[in-house]
Amino acid sequence: MNREYLEAKVDLCLNQAEIDIQQEEIARAIKNLERANSALSRIFNLEEEENE
């Protein structure tokens, strides 16, 4: 996966989590936050590989 895709996924998941929280869909919000976290981890792994 490329960096641009992962950054877009982070933004989308964070935005959806915010909507879920406003609608009191806490379980869905948590799942979207987990997805955002996963994408962020992949971004940082890409950066580490580039710096090696």
Task: Name each model feature, range by range.
Residues 6-52:
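Short, charge-rich amphipathic interface segments used for partner binding and complex assembly
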Residues 1-5:
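A ubiquitous short alpha-helical element
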